[in-house]
Every structure is written in C-alpha cells, then in structure tokens.
C-alpha cells in the first residue's frame, strides 16, 4: 500500500493497516510515531496490536491511556473488561463493562452483554446475570449457548426463590407468634433449653 504523509493521522492510518495485515512490528513503529504526534486514537490501535501479540500488560496501558483521554468507546471498555477477566478480576471487569454498555453509542452490545453475564456469575450476582440474560435472549434468540445459559439461570432463580420465600414466611410466622405472647411466655421460651 502507498499512503504518504507525516501527520499523526497518516501514521495512525498506516499503523492500523499494518495491524490488519498482521505486520505488528510495522504497526507498532507507525503507531508510536502517531503517538509522538499526540494522536489519541493511536492508543487504541497500539493496544490492539499488543493484544494480538499476546501482551496484555502493554495492551492495558494503552487502552487505559485511550480511556483517560476522554475518547473511550464501548470497544475499549470491553477490551479492558476482557483483560481484567483474563486476570480473574471479575469485579474489576464489571466496572469497565458496565461503563461500556451505559455509553451513548454502543457498537458491541452483544459482546458486552455476554461478558457481563459471565462476570455477574463469577461474582455470584445471579440476579443481575438473570436480568442481562433475559434481555440478551430477546435480542439474540438464535444464540444457542445463550439459550442454555438462560435455562441454567432460570433454574437457579427458581431454586433460590422458594428458599427465600420460606425464610420470609418463617420470619413472618415467628413475628406473629412473638406478637401474641405475653412477656412471661416469651421469657419462659427463652429460658427453655433447645432439644
């Protein structure tokens, strides 16, 4: 390809093309030149290059630079979330993923939702996972793996719901009994050893 020019945009564009061609060393060279000329988008592109090279530490640095520049988008937030997920830091990942899905222009809603479901499950927030999976299967009914996840979470929610209702009922019954006891009866029950 033949893209001439020495502006930050020219370097960033060439770096992006090299990235797509799998020529990561050339991509880094061009993108570092773009960064030297204060290209914000070059942070995103070079982060993707590092990620493709299996270097999540450097990728995270450049994704974070991109986010800190105020130019963050849902793709960058998802990428940062996935880096945290790979580290096993699911609560940290949720921070990025939730910010990403809350953005005005979300270009990767499906990926964000999939990652949110995973993170909510790993952090034992099954109610949130259930809410997202319901929305997900409505939006993407052809996704067979999401259908299985839906069934799993539905069964989990049904299994935990009766236990919660039973506990509430026992608490309400206990309160009703306590309300009808005289102070002497209540004291007698407290002094009686459990069998």
What are these regions (language model features)?
Residues 9, 41-44, 75, 108-111, ...:
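Start-of-helix register in tetratricopeptide repeats
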Residues 20-21, 52-53, 86-87, 119-122, ...:
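Register position in tetratricopeptide repeats
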Residues 5, 37-39, 71, 105-107, ...:
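Short coil turns that delineate tetratricopeptide repeat
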């Amino acid at each position: 390809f033949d893209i001439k020019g020495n502006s930050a945009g020219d370097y960033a564009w060439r770096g992006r093309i090299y990235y797509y061609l799998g020529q990561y060393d050339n991509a880094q060279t061009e993108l570092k030149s773009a960064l030297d000329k204060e290209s914000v988008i070059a942070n995103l592109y070079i982060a993707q290059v590092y990620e493709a090279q299996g270097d999540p530490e450097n990728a995270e640095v450049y994704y974070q630079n991109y986010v800190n520049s105020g130019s963050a988008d849902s793709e960058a937030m998802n990428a940062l979330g996935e880096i945290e997920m790979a580290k096993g830091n699911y609560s940290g990942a949720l921070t990025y993923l939730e910010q990403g899905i809350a953005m005005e222009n979300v270009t990767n809603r499906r990926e964000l939702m999939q990652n949110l479901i995973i993170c909510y499950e790993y952090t034992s927030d099954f109610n949130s996972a259930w809410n997202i999976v319901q929305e997900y299967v409505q939006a993407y009914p052809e996704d067979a793996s999401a259908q299985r996840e839906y069934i799993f979470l539905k069964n989990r929610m049904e299994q935990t719901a009766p236990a919660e209702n039973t506990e509430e009922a026992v608490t309400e019954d206990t309160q009703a009994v306590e309300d009808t006891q005289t102070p002497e009866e209540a004291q007698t029950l407290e002094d009686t050893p459990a069998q």
